[in-house]
Amino acid sequence: MIPGEIQVAEGVIELNVGRKTVKIRVENTGDRPVQIGSHYHFYEVNPALSFDRELTKGFRLNIASGTAVRFEPGQGREVELVEYAGTKTIYGFRGEVMGKLVGAE
């Protein structure tokens, strides 16, 4: 092995297999870019992003960990969200959900 070399296993890595997903259309109605990280609770993103928020409670972007999606002013696009796993207990973000999601198993 060479110092700094990364060795990876062969094959395809599948993310979030078997998890519930939803696709929604999102538009940035603001005058500044908005960037959303991979694990941010989508329901609580910047209010300048226009979409059906109720559909997104308990979901985050279905993208690789540590990555993000950026919305330029006036830009709209469809994104895929994936449901949080585990106890579905959410704290922080914008403080709109502070605890276990209602109806979470």
UniProtKB/Swiss-Prot annotation:
Gene Ontology terms for molecular function: urease activity
InterPro entries linked to this entry: Urease_beta-like (IPR002019), Urease_betasu_sf (IPR036461), Urease_subunit (IPR050069)
EC number(s) on file: 3.5.1.5
Places the protein is found: Cytoplasm
Gene Ontology biological-process annotations: urea catabolic process
Pathway: Nitrogen metabolism; urea degradation; CO(2) and NH(3) from urea (urease route): step 1/1
Predominant cellular place of this UniProt entry's protein: cytoplasm
Alphabetical keyword list: Cytoplasm, Hydrolase
GO terms for cellular component: urease complex
Transmembrane segments: none
Any Pfam family hit: Urease_beta
Known catalytic reactions: urea + 2 H2O + H(+) = hydrogencarbonate + 2 NH4(+)
Binding partners and assembly: Heterotrimer of UreA (gamma), UreB (beta) and UreC (alpha) subunits. Three heterotrimers associate to form the active enzyme.
Record's protein name: Urease subunit beta
Provenance organism: Marinomonas sp. (strain MWYL1)
